[in-house]
């Protein structure tokens, strides 16, 4: 039998441990931000399921700024798979960041957003807010977006291809002459027809932009519209196809490689309007503390949104214009004319079917897009 003094010490230790655990949970879920100090910390657990190119770098920088402005809050960022997020045994974090196609049942994971979370001072673009809306409830707050462009290898048209501008130390494309008013050359159809692989593209939303750019299709490979975005990018980088649909993040990354001597000269084509699924959204879960809403509001603020330009990403705010030249300026200008964002919670098969039918001229653009909004 244990001596009486050992039992007393063990009991006291258990009581102290339970008290500390209860104190931590209370502070995590109940303490208002105004009462937090450096000694009373609130922890925000953030999961990123997916991100546009440059999104993680922007987010990490903004989280550091957010913590400096709110000394009582610490953030913890983790990258997870969509499967891990939706597994029934998963203990959900406080905030989840994701892209269209990652989540199909938002009501099972997230709380509807209200107040500043749903619309930051009424300055968020409605087209992007609709992307995070499901059954008339706003579940996802758009944080930034990218688009789809068509990249064309210089091997097809050496005289027209250009080497992208050098990048700065931060990775942002350096300033170039504004070409937004200069008509883009047409797609080099005849030259593409002579290539072993004329064109590659992912399926789904990329096909909408591709259809707007092509007056006539070149010969399509057997794997057309079946590869992932990353696989298409790799094929273009290895010169296994002479033209390819890339995300703007991929296009900016490849421009950096080219200016550094690792890529090759090429040009890009942008459509006169933007149809995209490259939207980064944030949602809060049921047990999230009040600081989660504060973080979302901060990420949609003008201060945080202006910093998107360092990564070639686009703002979700109506009152900001970030670019004067280059790829990003062309895309931003097109979005001011017309912007459509595919609903985030639709099954990928639904988007693929509509885009494929439009690509082959079986339905009109309006018929394809309206069910996807």
Language-model segments: which ranges?
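Bilobed periplasmic-binding protein/Venus flytrap-like ligand-binding cleft at the lobe interface
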Residues: 280-315
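Extracytoplasmic/periplasmic substrate-binding proteins
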Residues: 215-288
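Extracytoplasmic/periplasmic solute-binding protein
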Residues: 139-144, 148, 161-218, 241
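Conserved N-terminal structural module of periplasmic/extracytoplasmic solute-binding proteins
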Residues: 1-100, 373
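Short helices/loops that flank or line small-molecule/ion binding pockets
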Residues: 83-96, 103, 229-244, 357-360
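Short glycine- and hydrophobic/aromatic-rich loop-to-beta-strand nucleating segment
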Residues: 148-152, 282-283
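C-terminal capping/gating helix-and-loop segments adjacent to ligand/active sites or protein-protein/ligand interfaces
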Residues: 2, 6-7, 309-373
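Hinge/lid segment of periplasmic solute-binding proteins
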Residues: 99-149, 160, 180-191
